[in-house]
C-alpha cells in the first residue's frame, strides 16, 4: 500500500487540467481546511474531492453505525483475503469521508465528489465535467 499515492493521482490531474482550461484557479490539498480536500476553489467557495472507487468504497455509505450499500460500482470490489482487515479499513475510510463532508458543509463550503468511475470513458468524463462546471458557475454567482 506504500505505493498508493494520496495526491496527484491520474484522476485528480485530469480534473485539475479541466478546471484550469476552463479558467478556474484552485489550491491543491489546502492544509488550512480540515481533511485537506483535493481541490479548493475559493472564488466559488467550492471543494472538489476526487475519490477512488476502491479505496473510498463507491456505492457504500456510513449510516452512523455501519456501512450500507446504496449503489453498485464495479470498481468498488472487496478483497477476498484478510476480510476483517479490509472491512475495518473501508469502514474507517467511509466514516472519515462522511465526517469531513459534514464539517465542510457546516463551514459553508460547496462540495462536489467526483468518483474515479466517472472519469473512465470520454462520455463519462464529459458528463462529469458538465456537472462540475454547471455547479461552479452557479456557486460563483453567489459569491
Please place each PLM-identified region on the residue numbering.
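Nucleic-acid endo/exonuclease domains
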Residues: 1-143
